[in-house]
Amino acid sequence: MTQQSDSTLETVGDAIARHLADIGVTVIFGVISIHNMPILDAIARQGRIRFVPARGEAGAMNMGDAYARVSRSLGVVITSTGTGAGNAAGAQVEALTAGAPVLHITTQVDRQFMDRDRGAIHDVPRQSDMLKAVSKTCFRMWEARSVHSALSAATSAALSAPKGPVSLEIPVDVQREMVAVQTNQPAPRIVRIEPDADALNTLA
């Protein structure tokens, strides 16, 4: 079995930063946490995306929401596990009611502790249920190899009608795992709603 060289591998955090930059993301709003440092360190290393820190997660989500509305493009927000994600929830409801395309990247405890109520730092039982209540849809990245497919699905969902905020949970241990470098990620696939011709004729 042939092993890949270090130059062809990168952390999931680096893959996330690279993917977002490749699809045109130039700014991310958020709050720095020990749980999202692998992603934010990668953003700083690559230097292709500006990170705008907020004093609280609600403010970060408001900024991401406003950015999405004004720019008519994807707003991206990054928060931390549990309380951090919860702090963004109220502002995310505002984005949901406005139909603003926001990607909410939040984190999760290591997979061995997820959904087990073991008291891991920042862990909140049923975090996914909370996020589903304030999101158009919610994804969870279980494996490093799904990093690009998960990001593509989440960004496409946010930008496809009806637009709205989409949450993506990424466990801390997954962020540190290694994956093959993939460059030049394609733009998100936007699913367009085609009107029914007969219905249009009836209305006309």
Predicted regions mapped to residue ranges:
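N-terminal alpha/beta PP-like core and its mobile active-site loop of ThDP/TPP-dependent enzymes
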Residues: 2-204
